[in-house]
A protein has these predicted regions:
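A short alpha-helical cap/connector motif
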Residues: 1-134, 141-162, 167-206
Length: 206
């Protein structure tokens, strides 16, 4: 399902071509070891569209992204923010990734919709006041639990957290299971896992 805006679609298509090329390169026999920082590691088209639909459907104006990477999901969230009149606050450890994401957002005409914070996401989260209507959690998986502890009090009633990589890669499944268990014990969260992309947990605060 395409977005209405062809400019945004072209930017997303560029990301998706890069992701396909990365997959082909790493799948080739004898491919050398790679630095994960060089890869998009994006949520993919289906999850991206779901992020857009969930955040626009809920008219989310205060959107938080934990893990900008190169900006694929940021473009989806910024497109949603433009639709709702909102803003995205995006956190990323690596400055060079933020710069790459900025360039993509500029090409998409969405740069005014995103505010970036560089540095450790836990340190940054402590400085953000919230409340947030919509949160995407897509950082290193050992950070999911501490991120949830900091985000949960800042989530608005009716606010949604989407956490990626609940099923894949298999090596992070223990952390994913621990995250899901914690969310479901929170007492004020309704939560479901969806088998799309690499598996996502969608959680809503009552």
């Amino acid at each position: 399902m395409p977005l209405v805006d062809p400019v945004i679609e072209r930017v997303l298509a560029d990301f998706e071509r890069r992701a396909e090329e990365e997959q082909r390169r790493t799948a080739a026999p004898g491919s050398p070891g790679t630095n994960l920082d060089d890869f998009l590691l994006s949520v993919g088209r289906d999850v991206g569209m779901l992020l857009y639909l969930l955040s626009t459907g809920a008219q989310s104006r205060r959107i938080l992204e934990l893990g900008t990477s190169y900006g694929y999901s940021t473009v989806w969230l910024a497109a949603a923010a433009r639709s709702t009149g909102g803003k995205v606050t995006s956190l990323e450890l690596r400055e060079f990734k933020i710069e790459s994401a900025r360039q993509a957002l500029t090409r998409a005409g969405l740069s005014s919709r995103v505010e970036f914070h560089a540095g450790d996401c836990l340190d940054t989260l402590k400085t953000l006041s919230g409340p947030f209507d919509f949160v995407l959690l897509d950082v290193w998986k050992d950070l999911y639990l501490p991120c949830f502890e900091l985000v949960h009090p800042k989530l608005a009633p009716g606010g949604v957290i989407v956490a990626d990589n609940m099923l894949l890669p298999a090596m992070v499944r223990p952390q994913a299971e621990a995250y899901r268990a914690r969310v479901r014990k929170a007492g004020d969260m309704d939560s479901v896992m969806l088998d799309i992309g690499n598996g996502i947990e969608v959680s809503r605060k009552r």
